[in-house]
Amino acid sequence: MQFSIIAISFLASLAMASPAKRGGGGGGSGSGSGSGSGSGSGGGSTTYTACSSTLYSEAQCCATDVLGVADLDCETVPETPTSASSFESICATSGRDAKCCTIPLLGQALLCQDPVGL
């Protein structure tokens, strides 16, 4: 029992220590000067990454949340979310909450957190 408490505490501290990655979109324009001129634009698109943490890397739809840490009866997200609101609505169709979890074991995602943007 003490080992599991220590293990969960250790994993939780790792999760808090890892920085969240946030994607940035590219954009810009340019013009040339001198004898010639030119223009350009960078139309980069921002890809939504719901679970950017190394530890909490699994996007899951979970039915039961225990104290905001452990989640039970989780399923893999059936489609790729394009935003935080789409992730939330995908899970809501089955009456579940959008979560980012550690690798689940037998449907029990023991450590979970809210995805980026929620």
Swiss-Prot record:
The keyword GTP-binding does not apply. Disruption phenotype: Leads to easily wettable (nonhydrophobic) hyphae and impairs the ability to normally produce its fungal fruiting bodies. Results also in stromal pustules that are unable to erupt through the bark of the tree. GO terms for cellular component: extracellular region. Residues 1-22 form the signal peptide. Residues 29-42 are annotated as: 7 X 2 AA tandem repeats of S-G. Keywords: Cell wall, Disulfide bond, Repeat, Secreted, Signal. It comes from the Eukaryota. Residues 20-46 are annotated as: Disordered. Induction: Highly expressed on day 2 and 3 after inoculation, a time when the fungus is in a rapid phase of growth. After a stationary phase on day 4, the expression decreases. The fragment between positions -188 and the start codon is the minimal but sufficient promoter element for expression. Expression is down-regulated by ther hypovirus CHV1. Expression is also negatively regulated by the CPG-1 mediated signaling pathway. Finally, expression is also regulated by the MAPK pathways with the CWI and HOG1 pathways being stimulatory, whereas the pheromone-responsive MAPK being repressive. Sequence repeats lie at residues 29-30, 31-32, 33-34, 35-36, 37-38, 39-40, 41-42. Residues 22-45 have a biased composition (Gly residues). The keyword Signal applies. It is found in: Secreted; Secreted, Cell wall. Disulfide bonds join C51-C100, C61-C91, C62-C74, C101-C112. Homotetramer. Further self-assembles to form highly ordered films at water-air interfaces through intermolecular interactions. Belongs to the cerato-ulmin hydrophobin family. Aerial growth, conidiation, and dispersal of filamentous fungi in the environment rely upon a capability of their secreting small amphipathic proteins called hydrophobins (HPBs) with low sequence identity. Class I can self-assemble into an outermost layer of rodlet bundles on aerial cell surfaces, conferring cellular hydrophobicity that supports fungal growth, development and dispersal; whereas Class II form highly ordered films at water-air interfaces through intermolecular interactions but contribute nothing to the rodlet structure. This is Class II hydrophobin CRP. It comes from Cryphonectria parasitica. The gene is CRP.
